[in-house]
C-alpha cells in the first residue's frame, strides 16, 4: 500500500513509526513532516490546506490511503474532498468533524441524546454571556466555540476571571473561533482521555491515557497543548470503559448517524470521572498529541490493518490487542513556550538517548546546517514503555537526561498521579 500521512507533530511521527512497521506498506509519504518523520517516510513539500494539491499528489503517486493527523484539515473538509475523487482517507467528514470544530454543536448533541456533560449556555454576544456568568457564579468554564489549538479554554476561579476570558474571546484573541462561546459549569473529578476507532457504525475502544496540560510541575501555570501523558489511565477501569461506551460513545455514534454525518475516524473523548460516573468534557476528532505517542508504544496490532478496517466499515469483525505494559511520554519544549518559543537552538544527543523500550518522537524540529534545531514550541517527545507507569517514567527521564539541549525544558513530574497510586497499592 502507498500511504500519505498529513501533519508534522509528535503525533504524526508516532503514527509514521507505527505505519512504517506494517508489512502491508509499500511506500509512506508525509506532508509536511519533520526530520524525525523523515526517517520513516519520504517528506513531501505539500501545503495540506490546499486540498486540490493534496488530491493531485494522491492521484499522481497512486495513494491507497491518506491518514490525516491534525484537526485543522478535517474541520476544513479535506476528507470529503479526497473521497469525492475516490481516494480512501482515514478521518471524519467535515460534518462529523464538527464534534471538535464547534463546542456548541457537541453540547447541543449531548442535550439531545442525554449524554452526561456539564450544564452550559451558548452565546454569541458579550452581554448575554456575562449575564449568565453573573447569574451562575464561579468557578465556571469559558470555551471559545471553534478551534483554538487547545488554548481556547479558561477555567475561571472568580467571576472577574470569567469576565476577562469572555472579553478576550469577543475581542478576537482567538479569531473566528471566539465569535461564539460556551459557558459551562465547573466539574470536579479526575480527567481522562478515552479513544475509539470508528467506522461510521461501530466504535471500538482504542485505549486510555491521561495528559498533563499545564506547563509547570505540580500542574501550575498556563495551559499548553500537553506536556506529557501516560497510558493506560488507572481511573478507566473495565467498568468505567463499559459505562463510557454505553452512556457517551454509543449515543454519539447514533446521534451523528441520525444527523446524516456518521462518524468514521478516531473519536477522542475528554472525560471527567465524577462520583456519578463519566461526563464528557469535549470531543476531538483525531488522535491526541501527546496521547497518540503512548498509545502507539502500547499497540500490539498492525496499525495499518486497523485503519483499513475503519475506512472499509469492517470494525464489527475486528479486535484490538495491546501490550501488557504502560507507556509514558515527556514533552521537551523550547524556552518561551507556551508563549513565543525561542527557535533555532541546537539539540544534540537525540540518537544516543533512544534505546530499548524508548522512542524519541520529533515535533517542532528542523535541520539547519546539518544540525538538529528547535523549530516550534513542543519540540521532542521522549517516550518509554515499562511494566508499570513508574518504570516507564524512570526510563523516559533517564533517556531525556542524555539529550543535550540547554535551551529546552520539561516537566519533571509526568505520571505523578499514577506513580503515587502504584506506590500506595
From Swiss-Prot:
Residues 214-233 are annotated as: Disordered. InterPro entries: ATP-grasp, ATP_grasp_subdomain_1, PreATP-grasp_dom_sf, PRibGlycinamid_synth_ATP-grasp, PRibGlycinamide_synth, PRibGlycinamide_synth_C-dom, PRibGlycinamide_synth_C_sf, PRibGlycinamide_synth_CS. Signal peptide: none annotated. The keyword Cell inner membrane does not apply. GO terms for biological process: 'de novo' IMP biosynthetic process; purine nucleobase biosynthetic process. Mg(2+) binds at residues 282, 284. Pfam families: GARS_A, GARS_C, GARS_N. GO terms for molecular function: ATP binding; metal ion binding; phosphoribosylamine-glycine ligase activity. ATP binds at residues 133-193. It catalyses: 5-phospho-beta-D-ribosylamine + glycine + ATP = N(1)-(5-phospho-beta-D-ribosyl)glycinamide + ADP + phosphate + H(+). SMART domains: GARS_A (SM01209), GARS_C (SM01210). Its cofactor is Mg(2+); Mn(2+). Keywords: ATP-binding, Ligase, Magnesium, Manganese, Metal-binding, Nucleotide-binding, Purine biosynthesis. The keyword Protease does not apply. Residues 107-312 form the ATP-grasp domain. PROSITE patterns: ATP_GRASP, GARS. Pathway: Purine metabolism; IMP biosynthesis via de novo pathway; N(1)-(5-phospho-D-ribosyl)glycinamide from 5-phospho-alpha-D-ribose 1-diphosphate: step 2/2. It comes from the Bacteria. Gene3D superfamilies: 3.40.50.20, ATP-grasp fold, A domain, ATP-grasp fold, B domain, Phosphoribosylglycinamide synthetase, C-terminal domain. Its EC number is 6.3.4.13. Belongs to the GARS family. NCBIfam families: purD. This is Phosphoribosylamine--glycine ligase. It comes from Mesorhizobium japonicum (strain LMG 29417 / CECT 9101 / MAFF 303099) (Mesorhizobium loti (strain MAFF 303099)). The lineage of its organism: Bacteria, Pseudomonadati, Pseudomonadota, Alphaproteobacteria, Hyphomicrobiales. The gene is purD.
